[in-house]
Amino acid sequence: MSLRSLLITTEAVGETTQTSDHQTSFSTRTYNEINDRPSLRVEKDGEKAYCFKNLDPVRYDTRMGEYPFDYGGQSTENNQLQFDLFTKDLMADTDIGLSDDVRDDLKRQIKEYYQQGYRAIFLIRPQNQEQQYIASYSSTNLNFTSQLSVGVNLSVLNKIQENKLHIYSTQPHIPSVGCEMITKIFRTDVDNENSLINYSVPVTVTISVTKATFEDTFVWNQNNDYPNMNYKDLIPAVTKNSIYHDVKRITKIHEYINSKKKKNGVGKIGGIQIAESKDGFWKILTKNYQIKLKFGIEGYGVMGGTFGNWLIDSGFKTVETNYEYQRNGKTINATTVASVKPSRKCGTRSPVFGQLQFSGEMMVLSHNDILTVFYTEREWALSNAIYAKNFATDFKRQFEVTAQSDELLVRTNVVPHTIKNTPGKALMEYSHGGFGQIDTSDYTGMALTFRFRCVSEDLPEGYYDKDKALTFANVGLTSFQDRQETNGTYWVYNTSTVGFGSCYPKKEFEYDINVTYTTLLPSDPEFTTGGTNYAQSVTAVLEESFINLQNQVNEMLTRMNISDLTSGVMSVFSVATSFPQILDGISDLLKAASSAFKKVKGKVGNVAKRLRGKRYVRLFDEDISIEETPRFLDSIRSSRRPSILSNMFNDDETFTALHTLASRTNSVASDVTYIQPIITTRIANSTPPVIAPASSVTYAKLKDISKIINAEIDPKSIMEFNQVSNTISILDSTKKLAQYAVDPDVIDGILNKMVGGHARSLFSLKVRKHLLDAVEKDAFVKYNYHDLMGKLLNDRELLDITNNLSSQKQFELAKEFRDLLINALA
């Protein structure tokens, strides 16, 4: 059974592809056509008439926003339940400093929104929600303070009529927190500069508008206590799209809030349904939850070199955390997935140190780097949502990530096996949040996202006190000299970086957070959008398999010196012509691996790189264009090589070479390995360089390439399309070899239009030229073009040359083969 037959048999798992029909596809129903259709249509059947509502899908524009939102005008379209107009942070006992222009603009905006049925919300959030505080207003003829309060408080201005303020508030007494802002903005009998507002603790003041309506908590007639108070009437218009809250509903919410009050008066909201609106099949739901966010940050390091004393790879893992906690007397099963994207390194990578000494660099979570945490629960509204928006949270806390130097995960093979290091410290702060897709061991679907930014200072080398010096990370050395200067400072090395190093074990963090968001859900609970119904654990198992495979490849690559790799390549080619025939039971395994790989391809960043471009498939009754990067498998399926490429390794031999070397974690032996499904699937989806005569490339694509490289292409040329380095190389009939860097999508487009006439190669044209030059320095001079191609594209003759290569040529050969292997398996 050949490799081509095996892979073609096992590739088509649950889909139909069309590789020859490469024309542009158009949908028979456009968005404009749907918009032009009437909302109701009448059809007659004899004497009977039937009325149908237009059930074509409605397009919803969603966004992921930061909270609080910036001050400024917002869209007036009715596609948002609530959004902010103004926000400001205030220190304790400091006037809000609202200028006349800002106050007038706010008043104008609020008046316009009231004409559309909105209400204004005045929300006060103290920085320390366990600290008691009061709000106060003072002017020439009116002074008042709220009662002592704790936590977040809000007041909704339902309307102003006949100098009476109709207010819904989270506080039952008059005046409530928020009334001071209402009075400052809407009073007409006093100048803005003569009215002052302050709070006894640091707070954030937010003014927003909402479509929801609330029953009045109280009606405040200030003239009863303070005569001559003047307000202009402000009455919201009644619209059919308003979301109504009756007294019973608000009372129920208040009873729930009061039941959660602690003895010290701190309000803990576990989960409140703020608003709900139904329209046909769908409903819009706004909810508030108190969640426990628990996540981990875990690093890794890989040692390599001849004796395993060099740190050749490091970084942070994607950490999945499954945990339980109590909310409202119920056990909540939650999952978080945390990932760190470091951008800087510390340490020194210097091969001149020798194989017996430590050398290497460690990735560092440093200034402006991002930590992203995805959160989901086993049962909640978001899991069955079509989309979500208006994410908000009260989390403002900073936290520090650090470790002990003796926790370093990597060791050398030289006594005493330890490596000097300083873990450093990273100060993290909540940046913004929103929504995203998550793929965990037991859930696939929508999740909340929390993004934390490292706010540690970006400091250069120099003299610092010890506390500051300990915030620098380093490996191979401590971050600073042991000797203390006379002024009490220490010299920090230039190989150090402020932040937290990656080669340390898992550190866990846990915080209580309030979140609010709006979702679109099916109004009938019998309808489902999937949620956990399609959450397959196979994706997690497959990811773990890929990680294990990557670790094996890293270990194999790092433990091979140049001669090992070169001899390993030679050993591989010695068995390349004998493709492993041990295929008992492999078809089912390969089919499962191929199917699972498709499910996660492009979805999880560290499992498989997202493939580019389009691919043409038939889905139901429509042609869908999903062009992707052409793979090794595509070449196998359409392999019809011209005679000029006949002496290159065929597909079976090339595949066997990659598979055999990838299957070993030490120096390559001469025996044949059993075929491994995961490795087979990855190599089948890899992209080794493509070598083809110019005649195999369509005329239109040759013209496109000519424009890119600004030169005409000789029709007798041999061309190489390298998807590893994103380059095109051309060897023309004058025996001139030129290489051009191009956009990867250009290569994809060329290969997608190429039907056969090419071969996947283990080596580039550049390395082939170097191999030939090693034994025949004047080969490009003395041979004519036809004979030169015969030697340059003869894999077996080139491999015989490798035993006579210089150290530099061996290094180039090994480096290219290593890059090719990483491309196939990483």
From Swiss-Prot:
InterPro entries: Rota_A_VP4 (IPR042546), Rota_VP4_MID (IPR035330), Rota_VP4_MID_sf (IPR038017)
Pfam family, any one: Rota_VP4_MID
GO BP term, example: virion attachment to host cell
Alphabetical UniProt keywords: Capsid protein, Hemagglutinin, Host cell membrane, Host endoplasmic reticulum, Host membrane, Host-virus interaction, Membrane, Outer capsid protein, Viral attachment to host cell, Viral penetration into host cytoplasm, Viral penetration via permeabilization of host membrane, Virion, Virus entry into host cell
Protein name: Outer capsid protein VP4
Disulfide bonds: none
Originating species: Rotavirus X (isolate RVX/Human/Bangladesh/NADRV-B219/2002/GXP[X])
Sites annotated Probable cleavage: R249, I250, K262, K263
Residues forming coiled coils: none
Lineage of origin: Viruses, Riboviria, Orthornavirae, Duplornaviricota, Resentoviricetes
GO cellular component, one term: host cell endoplasmic reticulum-Golgi intermediate compartment
Domain of life, source organism: Viruses
Family: Belongs to the rotavirus VP4 family.
